């Protein structure tokens, strides 16, 4: 659009200027033959040049009707030529000088008047009625003879000289018929639409030669930076006969560079003023070297600037020697030259814009190829940098290219601090040539250490990779410049290296002798940290690097930085992967069971399943030693016929079981024994619950493996804790964090040498069993259970009996895994409450960590301060998760009813305990929940005159007797009955006399713990029993009532009295309940 706009403006401006060009020779009498070529110069020349007077011209042939006297156009009797004809009669106002139509001052005859404009049909030479029409030559003569003085009759437009006509190629011979105005317009059209800069410059020089009758011309284009401008000869010494190809080839073969201010063209470029020289050899600015080489003698020179629309110099045009016999370029030539170059400036700028767009497209293609190479070559830094340097050398046409890589680990602290203090310095990308000053010397004190140097020389030279030493870097000028760039982060463009070396007192080494220009730029990564320096040396044409080169190189450096950074990251990743592989090998060695353990387990006899109680839903591992747990696992695999069915080597199976046990951490609940209990429940569901008939052998294998591995490497914390602490596991797995980790650990063990129990499976079976294992382990996340539960319930409620579909089988296996994972809730009470204590302790440990590390209040079930609420929370857990699951499973598979019934029984026990806690009991500080009475408190609004506490330590045989004795003492009311001395010899007695409000809390600070050994040698359970006797002084005026527990006192046992009969009945019931407890 911009180019089209300029072309339209160009055409409009041409129309406005053409009229004034015709006025150059309005007074031919004042023109010398040298100044103006018209028919009055010489007979031969006039005859040769003017086709109207040529005898061979049909216009002058007597037989030609236009020149024949009998021709009515030339006949005196013809009214057009007759003096009496008003058109030719002097008295005719049209030809009368006094007639305003012919008066030069008349605007109708003014060259700028459109009525006299060559494009105006009244003044157009081609118009037969116009006196200047060549075909009307006789008419013009007749008019003159009849006294017509009109200036129009004397106008003779300038035409091409004979020499210029002879120089025209065949395709441009039509120009000889045009006068100067039409020729000017035609030559403007000739260049208006040309966008090839070479063709355009050639046309400009040829056309200027035609307009000014110049022998030859040259055109220079401005190049360089604002501080270093120079002219480059685009085309030089172009004549009318010089072909475009020859002119371009010669200009490129011998490139002529002229700095601004040097020579005639340089002065014109610097001053923007025209220079017209009559005698070139008498001007000191003229350089005669070209004449001496070519043998051509330059006489007259006309040199004029070419500016763009902003007035900036974009080139200089120069024409030499006149061809029409004139010794110099006159004012008319200067004016024509100036006007034509005005349009040429617009055309040159359009062509340059077009050339820039083409170059930009090519550069983008090169950058895209570079980007493609970067992403294709990311595993080898040397190959990548070699490709980058090759592309840079081809793009910017330089002789050599180097890349220095920085060792970031060796950066000095002061430099790092400077980067932190002034980060904007790393973002600055300014091009400047290093001049004087202390900046370079100051920056040498803060150096980055270069570790690798890549160098690429000529086109046929291979890349050189070296690791320069500090000594080599300190004695290399190029390395010193690279050090400066890496330290400051600035782009450096040195136009004259030798001058720079002198200014900075650097020692000239051999590599500097052949260096004249250097472009050096930092290479940064995504964090704007300098990771290297790219250095270009010497433009191929000997010129300094331009501003355009800097811009291109900056984009190139960005791609270079991305490629090097990515490749370095890839190499680091490869190193980390190698380290990880070594670490996994070490981990695998230490995580795998030893050979001695494997051989021992392999040789141990394996008892029958009944001896381990594997078929029962009441299985417990409390009585099993660690080796027995491994044997029990082996027996389950044998009973399911998995060893022979899938050809599992027995020693591999033994090693795998021992390795799985070894990879469980010694946390309080989620340990190896929990995994054993889950696997045993699955085994019981398959065998006793008869669910194996719905499973394939491969699925049974996968489910047993998943049960044993479902909590591998458990840390005693849940998924929420991993997320809150932003642990590496939470970063690695965003959902089901621990479950994904458990599966990965399972895979790691299977991949360890000698542990792959799936080694005999086919690829298809292997994929199938691993899919089962993964899905089953992930199903142990309760979040997954809640997602799948509704779909499973819907299938069961619809009476589904076919579980062979892939989705339905996945649902069923997921529900079975959850049922096995929480199966401790269905164990006998003596097992269940011990397991609940272990779970609570692990939860409380996590709650303590949350308080310590996160400074947050944990949820109730993990808050140690709310330990007495655990029975109530257990009831909620059963109601929300366990009972619905076991109920729906029993509805479909009635053989697993024991799980449902055991859960119901334990719910009643937990509910009972929860009610006791509400009455004032606490239990969590004990190892077991047997008789969890700990504290006793008085009740408000009552007076206690004498409260006596007796704390007695009992054994198991004394327990029931103590309970009955306590009940008896409570029934006696205020009698002070003491335990016999021989029954409390192992205990202690504390009597407290207290008067005052009953709301005062009185606690027993003394307690003894009895460890009852079930086998007579090892403590198994502990019991605290507080035996109390309350004696009250009877007041004659106030009735007394037995002490009752206070329902509003949580964790305490209180004594109270009431005068209300209704309250007495209610308290009596609570008293009875308390007595039953004791």
UniProtKB/Swiss-Prot annotation:
Residues 46-64 have a biased composition (Acidic residues). It catalyses: 3',5'-cyclic GMP + H2O = GMP + H(+). Residues 142-166 have a biased composition (Polar residues). GO terms for molecular function: 3',5'-cyclic-GMP phosphodiesterase activity; metal ion binding. Residues 594-917 form the PDEase domain. Binds 2 divalent metal cations per subunit. Site 1 may preferentially bind zinc ions, while site 2 has a preference for magnesium and/or manganese ions. Residues 1076-1078 form a propeptide. GO terms for cellular component: membrane; plasma membrane. A divalent metal cation 1 binds at residues 674, 710-711, 821. A divalent metal cation 2 binds at residue 711. It is a lipid-anchor. SMART domains: GAF (SM00065), HDc (SM00471). Keywords: Cell membrane, cGMP, Hydrolase, Lipoprotein, Membrane, Metal-binding, Methylation, Prenylation, Repeat. It comes from the Eukaryota. Residues 1068-1078 have a biased composition (Basic residues). A lipid is attached at residue 1075 (S-farnesyl cysteine). Its EC number is 3.1.4.35. The active site is at 670 (proton donor). Its cofactor is a divalent metal cation. The modification Cysteine methyl ester is found at residue 1075. GO terms for biological process: cGMP metabolic process; signal transduction. Gene3D superfamilies: 3'5'-cyclic nucleotide phosphodiesterase, catalytic domain, 3.30.450.40. Belongs to the cyclic nucleotide phosphodiesterase family. PANTHER family: CYCLIC NUCLEOTIDE PHOSPHODIESTERASE. Interacts with PrBP. This is cGMP-specific 3',5'-cyclic phosphodiesterase.
């Amino acid at each position: 659009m911009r180019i089209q706009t300029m072309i339209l403006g160009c055409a409009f401006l041409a129309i406005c200027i053409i009229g004034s060009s015709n006025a150059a020779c309005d007074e031919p009498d004042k023109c010398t033959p040298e100044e103006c070529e018209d028919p009055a110069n010489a007979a031969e020349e006039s005859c040769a040049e003017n086709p109207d007077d040529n005898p061979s011209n049909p216009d002058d042939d007597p037989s030609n009707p236009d020149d024949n006297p009998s021709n009515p156009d030339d006949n005196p009797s013809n009214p057009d030529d007759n003096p009496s004809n008003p058109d030719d009669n002097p008295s005719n106002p049209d030809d009368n000088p006094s007639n305003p139509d012919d008066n030069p001052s008349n605007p109708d005859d003014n060259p700028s008047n459109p009525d006299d404009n060559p494009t105006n049909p009244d003044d157009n030479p081609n118009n037969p009625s116009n006196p200047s029409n060549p075909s009307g030559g006789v008419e013009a003569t007749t008019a003159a003879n009849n006294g017509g003085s009109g200036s129009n009759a004397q106008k003779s437009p300038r035409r091409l000289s004979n020499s210029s006509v002879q120089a025209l190629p065949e395709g441009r011979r039509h120009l000889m018929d045009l006068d100067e105005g039409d020729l000017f317009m035609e030559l403007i059209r000739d260049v208006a639409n040309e966008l090839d800069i070479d063709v355009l410059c050639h046309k400009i020089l040829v056309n200027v030669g035609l307009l000014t009758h110049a022998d030859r011309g040259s055109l220079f284009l401005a190049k360089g930076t604002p501080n270093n401008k120079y002219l480059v000869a685009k085309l030089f010494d172009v004549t009318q006969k010089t072909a475009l190809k020859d002119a371009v080839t010669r200009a490129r073969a011998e490139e002529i560079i002229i700095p601004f201010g040097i020579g005639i063209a340089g002065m014109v470029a610097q001053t923007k003023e025209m220079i017209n020289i009559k005698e070139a050899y008498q001007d000191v600015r003229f350089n005669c070297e070209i004449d001496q080489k070519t043998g051509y003698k330059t006489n007259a020179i006309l040199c004029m600037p070419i500016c763009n629309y902003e007035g900036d110099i974009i080139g200089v045009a120069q024409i030499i020697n006149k061809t029409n016999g004139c010794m110099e370029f006159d004012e008319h030539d200067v004016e024509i030259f100036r006007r034509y170059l005005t349009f040429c400036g617009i055309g040159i700028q359009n062509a340059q814009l077009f050339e820039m767009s083409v170059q930009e497209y090519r550069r983008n293609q090169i950058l895209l190829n570079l980007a493609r190479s970067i992403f294709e070559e990311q595993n080898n830094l040397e190959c990548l940098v070699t490709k980058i340097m090759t592309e840079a050398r081809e793009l910017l046409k330089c002789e050599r290219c180097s890349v220095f890589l920085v060792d970031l680990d060796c950066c000095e602290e002061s430099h790092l601090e400077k980067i932190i203090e002034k980060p904007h310095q790393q973002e600055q990308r300014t091009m400047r040539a290093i001049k004087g000053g202390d900046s370079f010397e100051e920056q040498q004190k803060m150096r980055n250490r270069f570790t690798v140097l890549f160098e690429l020389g000529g086109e046929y030279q291979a890349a050189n990779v070296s690791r320069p030493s500090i000594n080599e870097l300190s004695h290399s000028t190029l390395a010193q410049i690279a050090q400066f760039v890496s330290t400051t982060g600035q782009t450096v463009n040195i136009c004259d290296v030798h001058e720079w070396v002198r200014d900075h007192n650097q020692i000239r080494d051999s590599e500097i002798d052949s260096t004249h220009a250097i472009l050096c730029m930092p290479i940064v990564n995504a964090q704007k940290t300098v990771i290297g320096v790219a250095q270009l040396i010497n433009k191929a044409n000997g010129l300094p690097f331009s501003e355009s080169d800097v811009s291109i190189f900056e984009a190139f450096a960005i791609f270079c930085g991305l490629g090097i950074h990515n490749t370095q990251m890839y190499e680091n990743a490869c190193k980390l992967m190698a380290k990880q592989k070594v670490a996994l090998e070490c981990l695998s060695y230490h995580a795998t069971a030893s050979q001695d353990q494997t051989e021992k387990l392999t040789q141990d006899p394996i008892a029958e399943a009944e001896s381990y109680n594997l078929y029962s839903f009441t299985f417990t591992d409390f009585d099993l030693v660690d080796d027995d747990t491994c044997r029990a696992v082996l027996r389950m695999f044998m009973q399911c016929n998995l060893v022979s069915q899938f050809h599992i080597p027995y020693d591999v199976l033994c090693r795998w079981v021992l390795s799985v046990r070894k990879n469980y951490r010694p946390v309080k609940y989620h340990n190896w024994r929990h995994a054993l209990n889950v696997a045993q429940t699955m085994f019981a569901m398959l065998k006793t619950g008869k669910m194996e008939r719905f499973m394939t052998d491969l699925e049974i294998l996968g489910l047993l493996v998943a049960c044993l591995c479902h909590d591998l490497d458990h840390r005693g914390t849940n998924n929420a804790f991993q997320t809150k602490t932003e642990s590496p596991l939470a970063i690695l797995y965003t959902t089901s964090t621990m479950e994904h980790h458990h599966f990965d650990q399972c895979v790691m063990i299977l991949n360890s040498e000698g542990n792959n129990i799936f080694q005999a499976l086919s690829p298809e079976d292997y994929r199938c069993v691993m899919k089962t294992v993964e899905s089953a382990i992930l199903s142990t996340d309760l979040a997954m259970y809640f997602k799948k539960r509704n779909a499973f319930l819907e299938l069961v409620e619809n009476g589904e009996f076919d579980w062979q579909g892939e989705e339905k089988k996945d649902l069923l296996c997921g529900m079975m895994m959850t049922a096995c994972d929480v199966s401790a809730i269905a164990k006998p009470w003596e097992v269940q409450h011990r397991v609940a204590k272990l779970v609570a302790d692990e939860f409380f440990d996590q709650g303590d960590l949350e308080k310590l590390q996160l400074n947050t209040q944990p949820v109730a079930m993990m808050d140690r301060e709310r330990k007495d609420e655990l029975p109530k929370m257990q009831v909620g857990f059963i109601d929300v998760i366990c009972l619905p699951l076991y109920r729906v499973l029993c509805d479909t598979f009635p053989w697993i009813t024991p799980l449902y019934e055991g859960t119901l029984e334990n719910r009643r026990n937990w509910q009972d305990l929860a009610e006791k806690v509400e009455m004032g009991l606490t239990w969590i500080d004990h190892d077991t929940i047997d008789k969890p009475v700990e504290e006793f408190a008085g009740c408000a609004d009552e007076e206690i005159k004498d409260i006596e506490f007796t704390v007695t330590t009992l054994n198991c045989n004394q327990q029931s007797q103590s309970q009955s004795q306590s009940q008896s003492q409570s029934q006696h009311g205020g009698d002070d009955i003491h335990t016999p001395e021989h029954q409390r010899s192992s205990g202690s007695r504390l009597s407290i006399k207290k008067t005052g409000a009953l709301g005062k809390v009185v606690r027993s600070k003394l307690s003894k713990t009895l460890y009852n050994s079930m086998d007579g040698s090892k403590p198994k359970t502990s019991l605290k029993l507080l035996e109390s006797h309350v004696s009250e002084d009877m007041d004659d005026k106030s009735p007394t009532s037995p002490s009752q527990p206070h329902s509003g006192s949580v964790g305490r046992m209180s004594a109270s009295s009431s005068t209300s009969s209704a309250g007495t009945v209610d308290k009596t019931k609570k008293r009875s309940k308390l007595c039953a407890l004791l």
